[in-house]
């Protein structure tokens, strides 16, 4: 289980999170739901190590991950970014194997086998040699998910996974996330869309701006 205990975060004089505690059950999909400016993306960035908490603890199965960097936690916590962040000069397969070979020190052969397995799972086996400009928004989203999964994380975080897509694709994204449910992986999804949240959530955490 992933837990945050009594965490706070400010930017300058503006307090974003104030003494927040939540648990994220293993094998479940937890949705962090709320309006823009409510702190949901800040919370996700702190969980993933992209930002640091001002105070409080982050625990994964009792292991203290508080304020460790995203790179230090990359084998434990994966992130699917809102804008996908694919490298345009690399093809799909190269995008996916880059981190496992550099961070996890996997051989190129092992990383490629894992990447192809992820692409097959996500229905992209025929796109491994394509570049990002050749992909639709939904395909880029699935490549970003495959890249995160290739790091074999125990926690997979999504930042507004439908915001960069056409409205009609939100159901496809929900189906992908539901199909990835596993007893060994916690999924955390940030969204402002209550309809999307209802489709996927085992647990919902609502956040509001601090007044």
What positions do the PLM features span?
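Helix-to-loop junction immediately C-terminal to a conserved catalytic motif
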Residues: 48
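ABC ATPase NBD coupling module
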Residues: 64-78, 108-109, 182
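Catalytic Walker B motif of ABC-type/P-loop ATPase nucleotide-binding domains
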Residues: 156-159
